[in-house]
Amino acid sequence: MNEFQTTKQWLATELGSYYSQEEAEYIARILLEEAFGQPYPMLVVSDGKVNQKIDLLKGWLSRLLGHEPLQYVLGHTSFCGMDLYVSSGVLIPRPETEELCYIIRSRGHLFPGATSIDLCTGSGAIALFMAKCGAKVEAIDISPHALSVAEKNIHRYGLEIDLQRADLFDAHFSPKCQQYDLVVSNPPYVLNKERMEMEPHVLETEPEMALFVPDDDPILFYRRIKELYNNSKVLAFEINPLCVGELRELFYDRKVEFIEDFNGKTRYLIVT
Protein backbone atom coordinates (compact mmCIF):
# COMPACT_ATOMS: atom_id res chain seq x y z
CA MET A 1 0.00 0.00 0.00
CA ASN A 2 1.13 3.55 -0.69
CA GLU A 3 0.72 6.46 1.75
CA PHE A 4 -2.78 7.32 0.57
CA GLN A 5 -4.07 3.78 0.99
CA THR A 6 -2.55 3.58 4.46
CA THR A 7 -4.03 6.95 5.41
CA LYS A 8 -7.45 5.98 4.07
CA GLN A 9 -7.31 2.82 6.18
CA TRP A 10 -6.34 4.85 9.27
CA LEU A 11 -9.14 7.38 8.71
CA ALA A 12 -11.71 4.64 8.17
CA THR A 13 -10.62 2.84 11.33
CA GLU A 14 -10.93 6.02 13.40
CA LEU A 15 -14.30 6.86 11.87
CA GLY A 16 -15.49 3.31 12.51
CA SER A 17 -16.11 4.18 16.14
CA TYR A 18 -19.04 6.37 15.03
CA TYR A 19 -19.96 5.34 11.48
CA SER A 20 -20.69 1.99 9.86
CA GLN A 21 -17.75 0.41 8.04
CA GLU A 22 -19.23 1.32 4.65
CA GLU A 23 -19.83 4.95 5.68
CA ALA A 24 -16.36 5.20 7.25
CA GLU A 25 -14.68 3.93 4.07
CA TYR A 26 -16.69 6.36 1.95
CA ILE A 27 -15.96 9.37 4.16
CA ALA A 28 -12.25 8.52 4.37
CA ARG A 29 -12.09 8.50 0.59
CA ILE A 30 -13.96 11.81 0.33
CA LEU A 31 -11.63 13.46 2.85
CA LEU A 32 -8.56 12.47 0.85
CA GLU A 33 -10.09 13.61 -2.44
CA GLU A 34 -11.13 16.91 -0.88
CA ALA A 35 -7.74 17.55 0.72
CA PHE A 36 -5.70 16.79 -2.39
CA GLY A 37 -8.15 17.82 -5.11
CA GLN A 38 -7.85 14.56 -7.04
CA PRO A 39 -9.94 11.39 -7.40
CA TYR A 40 -8.82 8.66 -5.04
CA PRO A 41 -7.72 6.25 -7.83
CA MET A 42 -5.28 8.92 -9.04
CA LEU A 43 -3.94 9.45 -5.53
CA VAL A 44 -3.26 5.73 -5.17
CA VAL A 45 -0.94 5.73 -8.20
CA SER A 46 0.68 9.09 -7.44
CA ASP A 47 3.90 9.78 -5.60
CA GLY A 48 2.36 12.58 -3.52
CA LYS A 49 3.02 12.94 0.19
CA VAL A 50 0.19 12.70 2.68
CA ASN A 51 2.09 14.70 5.29
CA GLN A 52 1.45 17.85 3.24
CA LYS A 53 -2.18 17.73 4.38
CA ILE A 54 -2.04 15.60 7.51
CA ASP A 55 -2.92 18.46 9.88
CA LEU A 56 -5.94 19.32 7.75
CA LEU A 57 -7.06 15.68 7.74
CA LYS A 58 -6.62 15.41 11.51
CA GLY A 59 -8.69 18.54 12.00
CA TRP A 60 -11.50 17.22 9.83
CA LEU A 61 -11.37 13.86 11.60
CA SER A 62 -11.66 15.51 15.00
CA ARG A 63 -14.71 17.48 13.91
CA LEU A 64 -16.38 14.39 12.45
CA LEU A 65 -15.77 12.43 15.64
CA GLY A 66 -17.35 15.36 17.48
CA HIS A 67 -20.60 14.60 15.59
CA GLU A 68 -20.24 17.45 13.09
CA PRO A 69 -21.79 16.53 9.71
CA LEU A 70 -19.43 15.96 6.80
CA GLN A 71 -21.10 18.75 4.83
CA TYR A 72 -20.31 21.30 7.55
CA VAL A 73 -16.76 20.03 7.88
CA LEU A 74 -16.10 20.41 4.15
CA GLY A 75 -18.23 23.55 3.81
CA HIS A 76 -20.26 22.40 0.84
CA THR A 77 -22.69 19.78 -0.43
CA SER A 78 -24.11 18.53 -3.71
CA PHE A 79 -27.70 19.36 -4.67
CA CYS A 80 -29.34 18.73 -8.04
CA GLY A 81 -26.01 18.90 -9.84
CA MET A 82 -24.92 22.05 -8.01
CA ASP A 83 -22.18 22.39 -5.43
CA LEU A 84 -23.66 24.51 -2.65
CA TYR A 85 -21.96 26.31 0.22
CA VAL A 86 -23.30 25.26 3.64
CA SER A 87 -22.28 26.09 7.19
CA SER A 88 -23.48 25.33 10.69
CA GLY A 89 -26.72 27.10 11.48
CA VAL A 90 -28.23 26.27 8.08
CA LEU A 91 -30.13 23.09 7.30
CA ILE A 92 -28.18 20.72 5.06
CA PRO A 93 -30.13 20.05 1.83
CA ARG A 94 -31.32 16.44 1.70
CA PRO A 95 -31.77 13.98 -1.18
CA GLU A 96 -35.50 14.03 -0.38
CA THR A 97 -35.59 17.72 -1.25
CA GLU A 98 -33.75 17.05 -4.50
CA GLU A 99 -36.52 14.60 -5.34
CA LEU A 100 -39.15 17.29 -4.70
CA CYS A 101 -37.36 19.56 -7.18
CA TYR A 102 -37.31 16.87 -9.83
CA ILE A 103 -41.01 16.12 -9.25
CA ILE A 104 -42.15 19.70 -9.82
CA ARG A 105 -40.02 19.97 -12.95
CA SER A 106 -41.09 16.63 -14.42
CA ARG A 107 -44.78 17.43 -13.90
CA GLY A 108 -44.53 20.72 -15.75
CA HIS A 109 -45.11 22.93 -12.71
CA LEU A 110 -41.71 24.55 -13.18
CA PHE A 111 -41.06 26.22 -16.52
CA PRO A 112 -39.17 29.22 -17.98
CA GLY A 113 -40.77 32.47 -16.84
CA ALA A 114 -42.88 30.85 -14.11
CA THR A 115 -43.51 33.17 -11.17
CA SER A 116 -42.33 31.15 -8.19
CA ILE A 117 -41.36 31.47 -4.56
CA ASP A 118 -39.37 29.28 -2.16
CA LEU A 119 -40.55 29.69 1.43
CA CYS A 120 -38.11 28.82 4.25
CA THR A 121 -35.31 28.82 1.68
CA GLY A 122 -32.38 28.06 4.03
CA SER A 123 -29.28 27.62 1.85
CA GLY A 124 -31.33 28.61 -1.19
CA ALA A 125 -31.21 25.12 -2.70
CA ILE A 126 -34.78 24.95 -4.06
CA ALA A 127 -34.72 28.58 -5.21
CA LEU A 128 -31.47 28.01 -7.08
CA PHE A 129 -32.89 24.94 -8.82
CA MET A 130 -35.97 26.88 -9.90
CA ALA A 131 -33.88 29.79 -11.17
CA LYS A 132 -31.65 27.43 -13.15
CA CYS A 133 -34.83 26.14 -14.81
CA GLY A 134 -35.60 29.70 -15.95
CA ALA A 135 -38.29 30.61 -13.42
CA LYS A 136 -38.68 34.07 -11.90
CA VAL A 137 -37.86 33.34 -8.28
CA GLU A 138 -38.41 34.90 -4.88
CA ALA A 139 -36.96 33.27 -1.76
CA ILE A 140 -37.84 33.99 1.86
CA ASP A 141 -36.32 33.04 5.20
CA ILE A 142 -36.42 34.47 8.71
CA SER A 143 -32.77 33.65 9.51
CA PRO A 144 -30.15 36.28 8.58
CA HIS A 145 -27.46 33.60 8.62
CA ALA A 146 -29.41 31.35 6.26
CA LEU A 147 -29.93 34.29 3.91
CA SER A 148 -26.21 35.07 3.91
CA VAL A 149 -25.49 31.47 2.91
CA ALA A 150 -28.19 31.59 0.23
CA GLU A 151 -26.74 34.86 -1.08
CA LYS A 152 -23.31 33.25 -1.47
CA ASN A 153 -24.82 30.39 -3.44
CA ILE A 154 -26.82 32.74 -5.64
CA HIS A 155 -23.71 34.81 -6.36
CA ARG A 156 -21.71 31.68 -7.12
CA TYR A 157 -24.09 30.67 -9.89
CA GLY A 158 -24.83 34.17 -11.12
CA LEU A 159 -28.58 33.74 -10.85
CA GLU A 160 -31.29 36.34 -10.30
CA ILE A 161 -33.31 35.59 -7.18
CA ASP A 162 -35.26 38.10 -5.10
CA LEU A 163 -33.99 37.17 -1.64
CA GLN A 164 -36.06 38.50 1.26
CA ARG A 165 -35.86 38.33 5.03
CA ALA A 166 -39.36 37.93 6.41
CA ASP A 167 -41.39 36.24 9.11
CA LEU A 168 -44.36 34.47 7.55
CA PHE A 169 -46.20 34.74 10.86
CA ASP A 170 -45.82 38.51 11.08
CA ALA A 171 -49.31 40.00 10.89
CA HIS A 172 -47.99 42.70 8.56
CA PHE A 173 -46.42 40.31 6.08
CA SER A 174 -48.08 39.97 2.69
CA PRO A 175 -46.96 38.33 -0.57
CA LYS A 176 -45.55 40.52 -3.33
CA CYS A 177 -47.64 38.66 -5.90
CA GLN A 178 -51.33 37.78 -5.60
CA GLN A 179 -51.03 34.60 -7.65
CA TYR A 180 -47.81 32.66 -8.19
CA ASP A 181 -47.48 29.91 -10.74
CA LEU A 182 -45.62 27.85 -8.16
CA VAL A 183 -45.11 28.05 -4.40
CA VAL A 184 -42.59 25.58 -2.97
CA SER A 185 -41.65 25.00 0.65
CA ASN A 186 -39.71 22.58 2.78
CA PRO A 187 -40.76 24.08 6.12
CA PRO A 188 -40.01 22.76 9.60
CA TYR A 189 -42.09 19.62 10.08
CA VAL A 190 -40.34 17.27 12.53
CA LEU A 191 -42.30 16.59 15.72
CA ASN A 192 -40.50 16.92 19.03
CA LYS A 193 -41.49 13.36 19.88
CA GLU A 194 -39.39 12.19 16.92
CA ARG A 195 -36.15 13.48 18.44
CA MET A 196 -35.21 10.08 19.87
CA GLU A 197 -35.18 8.59 16.36
CA MET A 198 -32.76 11.17 14.97
CA GLU A 199 -28.99 10.97 14.54
CA PRO A 200 -26.87 12.83 17.16
CA HIS A 201 -25.08 14.90 14.51
CA VAL A 202 -28.43 16.29 13.34
CA LEU A 203 -29.68 17.14 16.82
CA GLU A 204 -26.39 18.62 17.98
CA THR A 205 -25.46 20.72 14.96
CA GLU A 206 -28.37 21.56 12.65
CA PRO A 207 -30.69 24.49 13.49
CA GLU A 208 -33.70 23.48 15.56
CA MET A 209 -35.81 26.28 14.12
CA ALA A 210 -35.44 24.72 10.67
CA LEU A 211 -36.43 21.26 11.88
CA PHE A 212 -38.98 21.15 14.67
CA VAL A 213 -42.62 22.09 15.13
CA PRO A 214 -44.88 21.73 18.20
CA ASP A 215 -46.38 18.28 18.62
CA ASP A 216 -49.80 19.86 19.22
CA ASP A 217 -49.71 21.91 15.98
CA PRO A 218 -47.39 20.22 13.48
CA ILE A 219 -48.91 21.81 10.37
CA LEU A 220 -48.76 25.46 11.46
CA PHE A 221 -46.44 26.40 8.58
CA TYR A 222 -48.67 24.76 5.99
CA ARG A 223 -51.73 26.49 7.44
CA ARG A 224 -50.03 29.88 7.28
CA ILE A 225 -48.77 29.26 3.75
CA LYS A 226 -52.30 28.37 2.68
CA GLU A 227 -53.62 31.58 4.25
CA LEU A 228 -51.08 33.63 2.31
CA TYR A 229 -50.70 31.78 -0.98
CA ASN A 230 -53.85 29.72 -1.61
CA ASN A 231 -54.61 31.77 -4.74
CA SER A 232 -51.48 30.39 -6.37
CA LYS A 233 -51.77 27.78 -9.11
CA VAL A 234 -49.57 25.08 -7.57
CA LEU A 235 -48.32 24.56 -4.01
CA ALA A 236 -45.60 21.94 -3.56
CA PHE A 237 -44.36 20.80 -0.17
CA GLU A 238 -42.06 18.41 1.58
CA ILE A 239 -44.05 16.95 4.46
CA ASN A 240 -43.99 14.72 7.52
CA PRO A 241 -45.63 11.35 6.72
CA LEU A 242 -47.33 11.52 10.14
CA CYS A 243 -49.33 14.57 9.06
CA VAL A 244 -51.00 13.33 5.88
CA GLY A 245 -54.48 13.28 7.39
CA GLU A 246 -54.26 16.80 8.80
CA LEU A 247 -52.87 18.16 5.54
CA ARG A 248 -55.61 16.50 3.52
CA GLU A 249 -58.18 18.23 5.74
CA LEU A 250 -56.34 21.56 5.50
CA PHE A 251 -56.45 21.59 1.71
CA TYR A 252 -60.00 20.23 1.48
CA ASP A 253 -60.86 22.89 -1.13
CA ARG A 254 -58.03 21.98 -3.53
CA LYS A 255 -56.94 18.93 -5.46
CA VAL A 256 -54.18 17.19 -3.49
CA GLU A 257 -51.67 14.52 -4.42
CA PHE A 258 -49.45 12.79 -1.89
CA ILE A 259 -46.27 11.24 -3.28
CA GLU A 260 -43.85 8.78 -1.72
CA ASP A 261 -40.10 9.38 -1.60
CA PHE A 262 -37.39 6.90 -2.60
CA ASN A 263 -37.73 5.25 0.82
CA GLY A 264 -41.42 4.56 0.33
CA LYS A 265 -42.53 7.24 2.81
CA THR A 266 -45.23 9.78 1.98
CA ARG A 267 -42.97 12.82 1.71
CA TYR A 268 -44.48 15.24 -0.80
CA LEU A 269 -47.74 17.10 -1.24
CA ILE A 270 -48.72 18.73 -4.53
CA VAL A 271 -51.74 21.04 -4.33
CA THR A 272 -53.38 22.17 -7.58
Region spans (language model):
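A general structural signal for well-ordered alpha-helical segments in protein cores
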Residues: K8, A28, L57, L70, ...
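A short N-terminal interaction module
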Residues: M1-L57
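Mobile active-site "lid"/loop adjacent to the S-adenosyl-L-methionine
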Residues: Y189-L220
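Residue-level signal for inorganic ion chemistry
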Residues: L31, H67, T97, I126, ...
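Conserved SAM/SAH cofactor-binding pocket of Class I
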Residues: E96-R195
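Conserved AdoMet
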Residues: E33-S106
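Conserved Class I SAM-dependent methyltransferase catalytic core
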Residues: D215-V271
